[in-house]
Amino acid sequence: MTTQFSVAGIELELARYPKDQESNLQAWDAADEHLIKHLIETEQTPVVTAIINDNFGALTACLRSIAPTWPLMVETDAKTSLLGNLQNLATNNLSSEGIEWLNSREALPEQIELVLMKLPKNLTYFAHQLNRLSQVLPKGTQVLISAKAKSINKSVLELIGKNLGSASASLTWKKTRVITCISDGEIRSLPKEMQWSVPRLNLEIRNLSNVFAANKLDIGAEIMLENMPKGDFKSIIDLGCGNGILGLHAKQLFPQAYIHFVDDSEMAIESAKQNWALNKLDTQGLVGEQATFGWDDCLTHMSEGVRPDLVLCNPPFHQGEAITDHIAWQMFLQSWRALKNGGILHVVGNRHLAYHIKLQRIFKNCTTVASNGKFVILQAQKISKKAEPFETHPTEAEAKVEVTESKPHPQSSLYGTKK
C-alpha cells in the first residue's frame, strides 16, 4: 500500500482504515491531490471550512498541516471515514483539537466560509448534501468539489445549480477536475425519505438518501429473505444492516430474539431505527431493549456482553470506489469471535466472491444453503472457541474453487429453503 502523500510541498503518511488492507489500495486519490493543489495555487487562507466526504482524512490532514489551527468541521456518513481521519491525524502528529465532527444528518453550523467536497457515487445523497448546505451557506460562499473527470458532466453541474448555486468545472489534471460552485443564498428543503412496502412480509421500509437499494429490495436481500435460518435464536446481529430488512424479518420469525443492527453508514443505522419503530416489532412481555443500533466499523466496538447465536450478513465488496474483500474478511472473523459456541453465521454474496473459502478458513466448515446463477447463501457454525481462526487471504488456486452444493454441517440443520 502506498502511504507517502506528496503534493504542492505537503508531505504526509496516509493509510486507509483499517490499515491491514490490500497493498494496492491507498488512502487518497488524484481528486484529493487536485483539490489541495488548487487551494495552494489560489493561496487560500485559513477560514472556517467544512470538509465533506473526506474518505480517510487526506483533505483534513492537509489543511491541518498547512495551518495547525485551521478551523474545520468534518462531515461523513461512514464510521470508517471518521476513524480514518482520526488515525491519519495522529500518524502525522496533527491535532484534532477544535475539529467539529458531524454525521450526515446533524445540523451544519452557520458560520461556514468555505466548503471542500469529494463527489460521492450516490447522486441522490449528493443532492441531499447540497440541500443541507443551501440551508446555512450565505450567498457567495465558495464550494469546491473534486472528482474524476469522467464523473463530471452537464447533468452533475445542473444538479449542483438546482440545489445550491451556479457551478463550473476546471481543466482536467491527472484525469480529475475541480468544480467551483458559488452559493446563491436560496434555502432548499430536504428531499422526502423514500418509503415502500414489502407486502408479503407485511413490512414498511424507509430509506434515507445514502442507503443501498433506495426503493426496492436488492437481489441479495431477496434471496436471503427466502432462505432464512431456522432455530431457537435469542440474540441476532444484522451485520451490514442497511435499512434493516433482514433484522426486521428475523424479529418476525423469532419474536423472542433481541436484534442488534450494525452498519458503517450512519444513515443506514437511522433507517433501521426508523423502520423498527415504523413496523412496531417489539414483543409484548419481553424484558429490556429488544433492538440496538450500532454505527460501527463491523463489530469492532460492540460490547463484549453481546454473544449472538445468529449473525445475518450481506457483506459489501466496495469501500467508496475501491473494490475490496477486506470488509468480508473482517465481518467473518469478528462474527466468529462474537458468536456463542455453536452459533451460526448466515451469509449471502455473489458467487464469484468465493466467500466459501474464507468461511472454511475461519470456521473450519461451510455449507451451501441455496444458490442461483449469481448469488449463493452460505452458512458456517462456530464449533470451537479455543483457537483464533486462520486469517490470511486464499491462494490463487483456492480462489478458483467452485461453490458446490453440500449437506448441512452435522451439528446444524438450522436453515430452511423456499418451499
Swiss-Prot record:
Pfam families given in the database record: MTS (PF05175)
GO cellular component: cytoplasm
Family: Belongs to the methyltransferase superfamily. RlmG family.
Protein name: Ribosomal RNA large subunit methyltransferase G
Main function: Specifically methylates the guanine in position 1835 (m2G1835) of 23S rRNA.
Coiled-coil region(s): none
Entry's localization field: Cytoplasm
E.C. code: 2.1.1.174
Gene for this chain: rlmG
Entry GO MF terms: 23S rRNA (guanine(1835)-N(2))-methyltransferase activity; nucleic acid binding
Keyword set includes Transferase: yes
Region annotation Disordered: where it falls in the sequence: 386-419
EC top class, as a word: transferase
Catalysed conversion reaction: guanosine(1835) in 23S rRNA + S-adenosyl-L-methionine = N(2)-methylguanosine(1835) in 23S rRNA + S-adenosyl-L-homocysteine + H(+)
Disulfide pairings: none
Keywords for the protein's UniProt record, in alphabetical order: Cytoplasm, Methyltransferase, rRNA processing, S-adenosyl-L-methionine, Transferase
Primary localization: cytoplasm
Domain of life where this protein originates: Bacteria
CDD domains linked to this entry: AdoMet_MTases
Organism: Shewanella woodyi (strain ATCC 51908 / MS32)
Annotated Polar residues bias: 409-419
InterPro entries reported in the protein's UniProt record: DNA_methylase_N6_adenine_CS (IPR002052), rRNA_m2G-MeTrfase_RlmG (IPR017237), RsmC/RlmG (IPR046977), SAM-dependent_MTases_sf (IPR029063), Small_mtfrase_dom (IPR007848)
Composition bias, Basic and acidic residues: 386-408
